[in-house]
């Protein structure tokens, strides 16, 4: 029979709560042996433990009271029932300043438990495996762990609860300062972490089961549970007067921005993250070697070529002025030749360079530009399905938009068919135009986005702006401004868009179609000898 620690626990809610007895049961064994050894050797704490945790502690020489000895009941039902017992939860929930609670504990042989150290079955890791079965997932739903955590956290006036191995040192340091006790402020903070953890844990379970039970409906469930973990505080938000932080979503694709490794450079800012995400989303639309140079969410330079060095040359030439302070995204490993070329032709400031990987020689050369942020994603992943945006008091969720229309699905609506060269450029322009803010027109030639008309309230202004920039780019690149192609993210409401494009050397157009005046635009194309194709899919980007 264990002694009931009652007298020393009586009294009002304590600013300092002594730790005499601890219950330890963890899935993540990181640092647990050292933590338990210090509790027992330095502070004389009695340790109760369960299953695998008890075994590890005993092997390390830590005196352990097995949970079944403490409760008087064996672990049952394959371990499903081991800590769900009054001697456990009574010892956690008893208010030491309540005479009735203390009397109940004494009359029922319940001792006080002053510290709970528990972390949970790795449910999210389990269900992240595509081959996981429902049965296996359910077996990884922790019951006893959350129950103990919640009991201890509820009674944080008297009980210290630790759910994160990162807090072991903090608790021990405080016990050294306070003669084996913890402070109320620390216990409250640790309890808050517990409730955040258990809420997120239950949310992950609900999200998984929603996907299994609700099937297709689960994409947009009645209740959307979003768990995000703070990765870092940011220096400021979109502007210096705005504070900001970056959070990582659960199940982030392996090669996403959230999982990218920063290899060098200053910390990423809020605007860096926004623009890098847009640039990475744009460049991963392409299968061939491609480079996107992006500024303020718009691709001011874009090109596809036989290799990334040539693609960078042509993307930079599209608009060198706008490239200043931009983001460069590459969809291939970056070799030394790229970096040398990049350093030679681009003396301007670049915020971020992102690619799947970099050769060692490339990184060595890049290290000379200490302020340049270099990110490696480890690969290209197109598995992301949804995107979210906030509105005042709400959250918008939609399918991610992909420019995945194949050329053989296009409908040629004009008398003239596009040439093979025009068709290749149309496919390229269509993918780039999708990433431009609406209303958007993108003029291209030879697999380069030489003219961009982004974010205009009316489409004809977007067309005019794109054409003017294309003419300037052609002059700068030493190529003629004829035989250009144009992409529009949405249909032409009037034929004036065709008139504008035709006047500036455009010979082929790609757009969704669907306007009540499509016939007028088609007739205008036929007048100018322009080939036009409809994709049947719009790509607004707001």
Could you tell me what each predicted segment is?
Residues 2-70:
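N-terminal glycine-/serine-/threonine-rich phosphate-binding loop
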Residues 15-24, 115-121, 201-203, 211-542:
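ATP-dependent carboxylate/acyl-activation modules
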Residues 33-43, 124-141, 147, 279-288, ...:
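Short, hydrophobic/aliphatic alpha-helical segments
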Residues 40-41, 58, 142, 153, ...:
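Anion (oxyanion) recognition and catalysis
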Residues 52-123:
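Glycine-rich nucleotide/cofactor/substrate-binding loop typically near the N-terminus or early
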Residues 96-143, 150-152, 414-420:
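Active-site/ligand-binding-proximal alpha/beta "capping" segment
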Residues 148, 155-171:
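Mobile "lid/hinge" segments at catalytic clefts and subdomain interfaces of large enzymes
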Residues 165-166, 170-224, 234:
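Non-catalytic interaction/clamp surfaces of large macromolecular machines
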């Amino acid at each position: 029979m264990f002694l009931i620690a009652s007298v020393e626990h009586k009294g009002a809610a304590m600013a300092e709560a002594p730790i005499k007895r601890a219950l330890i049961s963890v899935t993540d064994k990181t640092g647990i042996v050292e933590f338990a050894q210090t509790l027992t050797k330095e502070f004389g704490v009695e340790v109760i433990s369960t299953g695998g945790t008890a075994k590890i502690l005993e092997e390390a020489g830590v005196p352990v009271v097995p949970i079944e000895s403490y409760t008087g009941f064996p672990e049952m039902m394959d371990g499903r029932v081991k800590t769900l017992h009054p001697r456990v939860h009574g010892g956690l929930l008893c208010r030491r300043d309540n005479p009735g609670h203390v009397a109940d504990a004494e009359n029922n042989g319940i001792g006080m438990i002053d510290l709970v150290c528990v972390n949970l079955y790795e449910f999210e890791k389990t269900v992240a495996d595509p081959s996981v079965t429902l049965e296996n997932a359910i077996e990884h739903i922790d019951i006893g762990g959350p129950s103990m955590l919640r009991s201890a956290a509820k009674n944080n006036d008297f009980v210290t609860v630790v759910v994160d191995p990162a807090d072991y040192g903090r608790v021990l340091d405080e016990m050294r300062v306070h003669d084996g006790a913890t402070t109320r402020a620390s216990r409250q903070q640790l309890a808050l972490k517990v409730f955040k953890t258990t809420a997120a844990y239950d949310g992950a379970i609900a999200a998984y089961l929603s996907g299994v039970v609700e099937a297709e409906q689960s994409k947009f469930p009645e209740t959307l549970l979003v768990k995000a973990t703070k990765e870092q505080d940011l220096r400021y938000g979109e502007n210096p007067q705005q504070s900001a932080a970056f959070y990582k979503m659960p199940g982030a694709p392996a090669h996403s921005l959230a999982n990218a490794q920063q290899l060098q450079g200053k910390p990423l800012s809020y605007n860096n993250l926004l623009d890098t995400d847009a640039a990475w989303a744009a460049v991963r639309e392409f299968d061939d070697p491609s480079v996107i140079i992006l500024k303020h969410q718009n691709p001011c330079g874009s090109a596809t070529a036989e290799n990334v060095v040539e693609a960078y040359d042509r993307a930079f030439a599209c608009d060198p002025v706008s490239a200043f302070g931009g983001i460069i995204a590459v969809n291939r490993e970056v070799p030394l030749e790229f970096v040398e070329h990049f350093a030679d032709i681009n003396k301007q400031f670049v915020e971020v360079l992102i690619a799947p990987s970099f050769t060692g020689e490339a990184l060595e050369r890049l290290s000379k530009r200490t302020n340049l942020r270099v990110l490696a994603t480890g690969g290209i992943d197109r598995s992301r399905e949804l995107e979210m945006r906030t509105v005042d008091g709400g959250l918008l969720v939609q399918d991610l938009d992909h420019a995945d229309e194949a050329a053989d699905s296009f409908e040629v609506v004009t008398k003239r068919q596009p040439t093979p060269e025009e068709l290749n450029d149309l496919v390229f322009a269509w993918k780039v135009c999708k990433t431009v803010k609406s209303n958007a027109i993108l003029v291209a030639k030879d697999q380069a986005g030489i003219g961009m008309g982004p974010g205009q309230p009316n489409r004809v202004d977007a067309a005019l702006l794109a054409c003017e920039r294309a003419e300037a780019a052609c002059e700068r690149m030493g190529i003629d401004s004829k035989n250009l192609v144009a992409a529009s993210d949405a249909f032409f409401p009037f034929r004036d868009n065709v008139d504008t494009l035709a006047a500036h050397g455009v010979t082929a157009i790609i757009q969704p179609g669907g306007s009540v005046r499509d016939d007028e635009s088609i007739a205008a194309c036929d007048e100018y000898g322009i080939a036009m194709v409809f994709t049947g899919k719009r790509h607004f980007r707001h």
